[in-house]
């Protein structure tokens, strides 16, 4: 194993994981830095620091998944024994990591109750997380809202394979009419964790937006969920400018 003697305490204050989290927010920390906060310490004098150990753990996980760019996903179902097989990770560090992973899952799976006003993509993703976030196959779901954006319910429209799912606008709007919904948010998951929309995703979104115009039921967003994160297509594509929904926002 490569020697890494620089301690976290020797880093400039702005580069230390805890200080960086407090000053910039958790989103701006690398996965290795987040692990370092959980680990607390590294392997001891003259060996890997906490950040170095975090990097080493991710390297080991990347080898386990066969994809170094998606190492974090291996934490989803890892066992204590598998973690403790990594040099420098004993029972205390392993249980801390596993507790954090489980807490993160529970946060994402805790959904707002009906009548909650859904006023952001993050809140919509929280409602849909239990149905979409960690699934091994693609699913397409719809979030049903009233005219004031209050939550009426959610419904999984279709379940596909590990790489694709199919949904037809007819099925989506049938559920909206059945529940007397005035607004919709559609969503599907990418089991790979890659949240970039495919051309098929964009084409389907445009079809559904056009159907929303005809039905006079605005489609507020299309979310892609996966691996603990989400992407709003309304925020990153011009589709809502091309097919306005008459919902009072551009």
Swiss-Prot record:
Motif JAMM motif per record, residues: 188-201
SMART domains, per the entry: HhH1
GO molecular function, one term: DNA binding
Pfam families: RadC, UPF0758_N
InterPro entries reported for this sequence: Hlx-hairpin-Hlx_DNA-bd_motif, MPN, RadC_JAB, UPF0758, UPF0758_CS, UPF0758_N
Binding locations of Zn(2+): 188, 190, 201
MPN domain boundaries: 116-239
GO aspect biological process, one term: proteolysis
Record key words, sorted: Hydrolase, Metal-binding, Metalloprotease, Protease, Zinc
Tree of life domain: Bacteria
PANTHER family noted in UniProt: DNA REPAIR PROTEIN RADC (PTHR30471), UPF0758 PROTEIN YEES-RELATED (PTHR30471:SF3)
Family note: Belongs to the UPF0758 family.
The protein, known as: UPF0758 protein tlr1707
Species whose genome carries this gene: Thermosynechococcus vestitus (strain NIES-2133 / IAM M-273 / BP-1)
